[in-house]
């Protein structure tokens, strides 16, 4: 969710990944998956031969992207993208970025990118429109409220049902409100998390639901008079997971997934999670 400005126009900003190597934290590197076969770099059918183009939204927020600059490789999703590129055999200067709004990226139709990282939860509905890579992060949803409000003392999901709640449209955060909290009043929906945060600050809603790492950033850096009430319990038998979005039927899906799987196996994903998302484990649990 983005987590997660007014509804952004689908304006694509291409930016070559040319940041100096010392701008990003080093990441563990195992054997590349690009040695032979269909996943060899020179056989990958990327939009631009010899380069791979990733996408994310604008603005792009911490802890997923630091400084609204994916090319610096800082932030969890930025670091994952560069680690995937390395596994596929791409040098840092062979990685490009473009900006695509969240909603546009998961709509059916040709994409202006090879893979998009923007806190996309893998759902059956979305899989009918786009491809997803193997998941790179298991996520929970969290509830934010003003520190001085009675909501801040809520300890159970049932305590939230009477509240005016809000979330970004089309997100699993909104779906969590509908499916898990089941509020008495229809939840408010917003085009972006920026609009949702403004509504919380203005008192139009009493609590906001976003993914947990985004909630940590909002409460610590943006809306300092708010607090994480708690994280919602896992929904269903399978955890909610983030995956990269690719064009439906993309020839790259299998190779990108193989790269993600290799990063999980060699410990890189765990290392990056500890580096960028360590505080997520400390949030209180709602029962």
What kind of region is each of these model predictions?
Residues 84, 108-110, 160, 200-201, ...:
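Hydrophobic residues within well-ordered alpha-helices
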Residues 58, 138-145, 220-261, 279-287:
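Periplasmic-binding protein-like
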Residues 93-159:
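Acidic, polar ligand-binding/catalytic clefts
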Residues 14-17:
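C-terminal motif of bacterial Sec signal peptides marking the signal peptidase cleavage site
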Residues 26-118, 128:
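Extracytoplasmic small-molecule ligand-binding "clamshell" domains
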Residues 59, 73-88, 120-122, 139-197, ...:
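Bilobed "Venus flytrap"/periplasmic-binding protein-like clamshell domains
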Residues 104, 120-129, 178-179, 201, ...:
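A ligand-binding cleft/hinge motif common to bilobed small-molecule-binding domains
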Residues 19, 30-34, 78, 82-87, ...:
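Extended ligand-binding regions for polar small-molecule ligands
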């Amino acid at each position: 969710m983005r987590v997660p400005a007014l509804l952004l126009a689908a304006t694509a900003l291409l930016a070559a990944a040319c940041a100096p190597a010392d701008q990003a934290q080093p990441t563990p590197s195992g054997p590349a998956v690009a040695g032979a076969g269909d996943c060899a770099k020179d056989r990958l059918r990327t939009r631009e031969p010899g380069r791979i183009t990733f996408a994310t939204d604008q603005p792009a927020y911490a802890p997923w992207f630091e400084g609204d600059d994916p090319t610096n490789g800082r932030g969890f999703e930025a670091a994952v993208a560069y680690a995937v590129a390395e596994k596929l055999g791409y040098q840092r200067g062979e990685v490009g970025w473009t900006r695509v709004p969240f909603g546009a990226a998961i709509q059916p139709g040709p994409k202006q990118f090879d893979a998009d990282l923007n806190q996309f939860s893998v759902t059956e509905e979305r899989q009918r429109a786009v491809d997803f890579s193997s998941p790179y992060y298991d996520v929970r949803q969290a509830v934010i409220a003003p520190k001085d409000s009675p909501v801040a003392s809520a300890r159970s999901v049932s305590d939230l049902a009477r509240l005016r709640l809000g979330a970004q449209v089309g997100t699993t955060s909104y779906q969590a409100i509908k499916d898990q909290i089941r509020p008495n009043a229809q939840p408010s929906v917003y085009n972006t998390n920026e609009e949702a945060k403004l509504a919380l600050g203005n008192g139009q809603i009493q609590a906001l639901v976003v993914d947990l790492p985004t909630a940590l950033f909002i409460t610590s850096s943006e809306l300092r008079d708010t607090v994480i009430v708690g994280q919602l319990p896992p929904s269903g038998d399978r955890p909610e997971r983030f995956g990269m979005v690719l064009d439906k039927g993309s020839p790259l899906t299998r190779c990108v997934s193989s790269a993600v799987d290799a990063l999980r196996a060699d410990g890189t994903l765990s290392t990056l999670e500890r580096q960028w998302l360590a505080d997520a484990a400390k949030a209180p649990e709602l029962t």
